[in-house]
Amino acid sequence: MVKLNLSNLQHFAHKKGGGSTSNGRDSQAKRLGAKAADGQTVSGGSILYRQRGTHIYPGVNVGRGGDDTLFAKVEGVVRFERKGRDKKQVSVYPIAK
């Protein structure tokens, strides 16, 4: 009869090691989108819409910044409008005094 020596048994892992990954990060949100609502009164220089590219085009009294941000050139009321069949624009109409 063979006698087993239990103190010499090796225990192997039943799960693989965790390893590492190159994922697990995310960039901060850029806070893009509308900053003024339709019908809202804004002052000159106010940011109306932050975007990457031209999702919305500048209309009357609206300028476009270097990063495609749309801003009001004059004080007035914001209007989001259609420009043709498939484009949108934002305009600022001065308040009549």
Curated annotation (Swiss-Prot):
Modification(s) after translation: The N-terminus is cleaved by ribosomal processing cysteine protease Prp.
Gene Ontology, cellular component aspect: cytosolic large ribosomal subunit
GO molecular function: structural constituent of ribosome
UniProt feature, compositional bias: Polar residues: 1-10
Entry superkingdom: Bacteria
Signal sequence bounds: none
Classification via InterPro entries: Ribosomal_bL27 (IPR001684), Ribosomal_bL27_CS (IPR018261)
Official protein name in the record: Large ribosomal subunit protein bL27
Propeptide residue interval(s): 1-12
A Gene Ontology BP annotation from the UniProt entry: translation
Region annotation Disordered: where it falls in the sequence: 1-38
Family: Belongs to the bacterial ribosomal protein bL27 family.
Any Pfam family: Ribosomal_L27
